[in-house]
UniProtKB/Swiss-Prot annotation:
The gene is miaB. This is tRNA-2-methylthio-N(6)-dimethylallyladenosine synthase. It catalyses: N(6)-dimethylallyladenosine(37) in tRNA + (sulfur carrier)-SH + AH2 + 2 S-adenosyl-L-methionine = 2-methylsulfanyl-N(6)-dimethylallyladenosine(37) in tRNA + (sulfur carrier)-H + 5'-deoxyadenosine + L-methionine + A + S-adenosyl-L-homocysteine + 2 H(+). [4Fe-4S] cluster 2 binds at residues 194, 198, 201. Binds 2 [4Fe-4S] clusters. One cluster is coordinated with 3 cysteines and an exchangeable S-adenosyl-L-methionine. PROSITE patterns: MTTASE_N, MTTASE_RADICAL, RADICAL_SAM, TRAM. The keyword Iron applies. Its cofactor is [4Fe-4S] cluster.
C-alpha cells in the first residue's frame, strides 16, 4: 500500500454492507410479492473506463439488492449520476441533468437521486449541490463505493440529503459484485490512483495515490471471467506502467501481462493508460512475446512543445517521446498507436502548437483523443498566466483534427484487400443486418455475417476503408 495515510476498511465493515444488502433484498422481494413489480434503477455514467467499471459495481450491488435496470428516468425508483470532472463540459452536463430532475422528484415521492464519482471529491461541488440542488438525496465519492448499500439504505429512511465523501483513499476492496455491461469484454481494475500530478489534471485529487491490486486477486477475477465466456479483457489504471510499485511482492506490469497471457479462454488482452515516462522495456517485451496482448498502445503525449510539456509536469521531452515511438514500432512492427492531445494549455504559442502538429505528423497515430484545455480548480495550471483565448484554441483545435483525421484515413486506406482477424462483438450500430467487431489494433470492422459468429474470432477481407472504420467481407 501507499505510504500515505489511508482509511483502513475492516472485514467487519464489509460484513455490515453484506448484511444490509440481504436486508434490502428481503424488503424488495416482499414488495415484489405484493405488487408484482421490481424496483428499477437508471445509472448515467460520465468519463473514463474507470468510471464505467465503477458503475458496473454499483449495478452489481443493486442487482443483489433486487433492482433491475431501466433506461427510462420516468420508470426509475433510483437515478444515479456517476460523474467526471476532467473537463468543465462534463460537469455542466451533470448540473443540467440533476436540475432537470427537480420536477420529476416532486411527482415521484419514492424517487431517490444519487450523485457520485470524481466531481463529488471536490468540496466546492458538494457545496453547490447542497445549496442549489436540494432535491438530491445522496452524495458520495470515489473512495467509499463499497459503502453504497449502507448509504442507500440510510438515504431511503431519511428526509435529509446524505453526504459521505472521503478525502483519503482506503484499502482496495475485493469481491464487490459486478454486473458487466458487455458479455464478451470486461474491464478490470489493476490499480487505482495516480502519483504524477500533471499540472492540468484533477485526477490525483479525486482518485487518490497509486495503489496496486495483488496479482492473485487479478488472476482470480480473470479466470472467473474466462469461465463465464469473456473473450477480451481491458486492464485499467490511471498509469498501468506503475503497476506493482506499492506491492510487497516484486513485480511489474510486464510480468502481470505474461501471467494473464497464460489463462485459458481469454483471447485478447488490452490495457490503458500508459504514461510515456514509465513505459518500460519489460512492457515492450511482454507485447512482443504475449500472443494475447493486442498490438495497440495508447500513449498520451499531450503536447509537442518542450516548454509546454515542462509546464504540464509531464517529465519527458518531445524528442524522448518520439524515440519511444520508434522503439515500440521497431519491437512491435504491427502496433497501432493512439494518443491524447491537449490544445490551448496556458502559455501555448503558435510555435508551440506547431510542435504538436509536428509530433502528429511524425508519430502518425491511428487515432487521437483531442481536447481543448479545460481549467480545473485546485490544479497549478489554473493559476498560470497567459491563458489562450477561446477563439485561438478552437482554430488550433480544428487544424489538429484535420491532421489527425487525414493521417487516420491514410492508415486505414492501407488496409484495402488485407485480411484481418476480428473478434465479433455484435450487430453494427449503423446497420442491423451487419456484424461489427475489432481487430487487435482496435480497428472497427463492419461486415455481413451470421449472428452465430458473435463471440468468435473470424477472418475478414477489407473491401472499403473509411476514416474511422473499415468495411469488409467475411471469409469462410
Amino acid at each position: 500500500m501507499s505510504k500515505r495515510e489511508e482509511v483502513k476498511i475492516s472485514e467487519e465493515d464489509l460484513n455490515k454492507q453484506r448484511e444490509i444488502i440481504n436486508k434490502l433484498r428481503e424488503i424488495n422481494d416482499a414488495e415484489y410479492e405484493r405488487t408484482g413489480k421490481r424496483k428499477k434503477h437508471l445509472t448515467v455514467t460520465y468519463g473514463c473506463q474507470m468510471n464505467e467499471h465503477d458503475s458496473e459495481k454499483l449495478a452489481g450491488i443493486l442487482q443483489n439488492i433486487g433492482y433491475i435496470e431501466t433506461n427510462d428516468k420516468n420508470e426509475a425508483n433510483l437515478i444515479i449520476y456517476n460523474t467526471c470532472c476532467v473537463r468543465e463540459n462534463a460537469e455542466l452536463k451533470v448540473y443540467g441533468n440533476i436540475g432537470s430532475l427537480k420536477n420529476l422528484k416532486k411527482e415521484k415521492h419514492d424517487l431517490t437521486i444519487a450523485v457520485c464519482g470524481c466531481m463529488m471529491q471536490q468540496p466546492h461541488v458538494v457545496k453547490e449541490i447542497k445549496s442549489k440542488y436540494r432535491h438530491v438525496d445522496l452524495v458520495f465519492g470515489t473512495h467509499n463505493l463499497h459503502k453504497f448499500p449502507e448509504l442507500l439504505s440510510t438515504s431511503m429512511e431519511s428526509d435529509n440529503m446524505i453526504i459521505d465523501v472521503w478525502d483519503k483513499e482506503g484499502d482496495i476492496v475485493e469481491g464487490l459484485p459486478v454486473t458487466r455491461k458487455y458479455g464478451l469484454k470486461a474491464f478490470i481494475n489493476i490499480m487505482f490512483g495516480c502519483n504524477n500530478f500533471c499540472t492540468y489534471c484533477i485526477v490525483p485529487h479525486t482518485r487518490g495515490r497509486e495503489r496496486s491490486r495483488e496479482v492473485q486477486e487479478i488472476i482470480d477475477e480473470v479466470e472467473e471471467l474466462a469461465k463465464n465466456g469473456t473473450k477480451e479483457i481491458t486492464l485499467l489504471g490511471q498509469n498501468v506502467n506503475s503497476y506493482g510499485k506499492t506491492l510487497e511482492e516484486e513485480t511489474d506490469f510486464g510480468n502481470l501481462l505474461k501471467v494473464l497471457n497464460k489463462i485459458e479462454g481469454i483471447e485478447r488482452i488490452r490495457f490503458m493508460t500508459s504514461h510515456p515516462k514509465d513505459l518500460s522495456d519489460s512492457l515492450i517485451s511482454a507485447m512482443t512475446v504475449c500472443t494475447k496482448v493486442c498490438a495497440h498502445l495508447h500513449l498520451p503525449f499531450q503536447a509537442g512543445s518542450n516548454d509546454i510539456l515542462k509546464a504540464m509536469n509531464r517529465k519527458y521531452t518531445k524528442e524522448a517521446y518520439l524515440e519511444l515511438v520508434e522503439k515500440v514500432r521497431s519491437k512491435v512492427p504491427n502496433v497501432a498507436l493512439t494518443t491524447d492531445i491537449i490544445v490551448g494549455f496556458p502559455g501555448e504559442t503558435e510555435d508551440d502548437f506547431k510542435e504538436t502538429l509536428n509530433v502528429v505528423e511524425k508519430a502518425r497515430f491511428n487515432s487521437a483523443y483531442t481536447y481543448l484545455y479545460s481549467l480545473r480548480q485546485e490544479t497549478p495550471a489554473a493559476k498560470m498566466e497567459n491563458h489562450v483565448p477561446d477563439d485561438v484554441k478552437h482554430e488550433r483545435f480544428n487544424r489538429l483534427i484535420e491532421a489527425v483525421n487525414r493521417i487516420s484515413g491514410e492508415i486505414n486506406k492501407a488496409y484495402l484487400n488485407k485480411v484481418v482477424e476480428v473478434l465479433v462483438e455484435g450487430t453494427s450500430k449503423t446497420d442491423d443486418a451487419k456484424l461489427m467487431g475489432r481487430t487487435p489494433q482496435s480497428k472497427l470492422v463492419n461486415f455481413a455475417g451470421n449472428k452465430e459468429d458473435i463471440g468468435q474470432i473470424v477472418r475478414v477481407k477489407i473491401t472499403e476503408p473509411k476514416t474511422f472504420s473499415l468495411n469488409g467481407e467475411l471469409l469462410k
